[in-house]
Each structure stands twice: as structure tokens, then as C-alpha cells.
Amino acid sequence: MREYLFSESQKKGAVMRVLIFDTETSGLPVWSSPSDDPMQPHIAQFTAVIFDDASGEEEEYVDLIVRQEWPVAPEAFGVHGITPERSIEEGVPEDHAVMFFEAMSAAADRIAGFSLSFDMRIIRIARLRAGRAKGLLDAEAAVQKAKQFDVMQKCTALCKIPPTEKMMATGRKTWKQPTLVEAVRALFGEEMADAHDARGDVLATKRIYMHLKGLGLA
């Protein structure tokens, strides 16, 4: 794995850098439990890209399969399809994903994702598991919040997906927040061939981000 370092000149350049990242996991987070609960899921795949906000030119890219040394929920495997064999053959320790996220987020001016709160929670779980201090993460989260941009929330009004019956039953008549597949279909009239692969999700999210940028919404 290539060592990932940013020089001070890169960090201080005039270019606005955007980090988009995505995780596939061993299961869903237990939202009602603390992030350091041992029952919280692990990262199965971590993909991230840093690019120039103006041109979209990619500066850094990483795609990691994480070695699964813990049970994987059947429903999670059904989503991302990362087999135990592939995990063992290609996988790296989970803290590698943590280190890449920390380096890339420090170098970025904006952190973006599709349903960003999910992936930020997964990263927090992994960072605590890797021994990062909770107090430090809490302080950092307060700073990072200003840098965060949720592509899903920003494109909801553009996608114009009607509310579901469940939403209507509870009096919610706003547009439904799209899945990434639905957003690509609504905005570009295309079907995603590689949905729920972190690499495919990152590239699709970047495409939507640049579309929003062109409309003055990002």
C-alpha cells in the first residue's frame, strides 16, 4: 500500500479540495448504542477521492478492502458481495482505512458523501476501535461539521421523488430522500451498474456533486 502524505505546500494551495468517501460494512450501525460498543459493525471496504472543486480533477484516490476477521451479517454480504475469500486475499487491517481517512480529511477543505452521516458514524466507530480518544474525536467533529456536505440532502429537491405511503401516513409530504441509485436515475437517466461497491458509489457521488456545482448548489 502506498504511503499517503500531504506536503505543507499541497495543504496551503489555492485549490479547494473536496474529499468524497464511502464505506461498505459488516452490518448496520446500532444507532441507539455508543460508537465504542463492541457490537458495532466493521468496515468491509473504504474508498475515497480528493479532487479539485472547480475542475473535478482527481488528486488522490484510494480503494481498500478490509480483512474481515469478524462475522459479517448475511444482509450486509447481500449488499456489497465481498466474500471472505476476497477479504483474506486482498484485505488490509481496518486501521489502514482509519489512517487514510484521517490524512485525507485533514487535507480536504470539504468532506462530502451520499447520506454522509452514515459513513461518518462508521468512521467514528472504526477510529474509536483503533484507539483514538473519544474527547479528541468529539472536538474534531465540531470543527469538521462546518466542512461537511451531504450530497443526498442537497439533491433531494432536484430528484423530485414522491413521498412514500409510509411518509404520507405520518404527514410527511416532502420529497423522498433518494438512494444513490435513484439519484443517478433521476438526474442522469441512467442505471448504476456497480451500486453498493464503495468505488462505484464514490464515483457516482462525485458526478452528482459536480452536477450540483454546475447548478450553483455546491
Regions found by a protein language model. Name each.
Residues 31, 88, 195-196:
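Short loop/turn and capping residues at structural boundaries
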Residues 1-23, 27-33:
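N-terminal accessory regions of nucleic-acid-interacting proteins
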Residues 89-98:
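Glycine-rich, highly charged phosphate/nucleotide-binding loops
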Residues 4, 9, 17, 39-84, ...:
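Metal-dependent phosphoesterase core characteristic of DEDDh/y 3'-5' exonuclease domains
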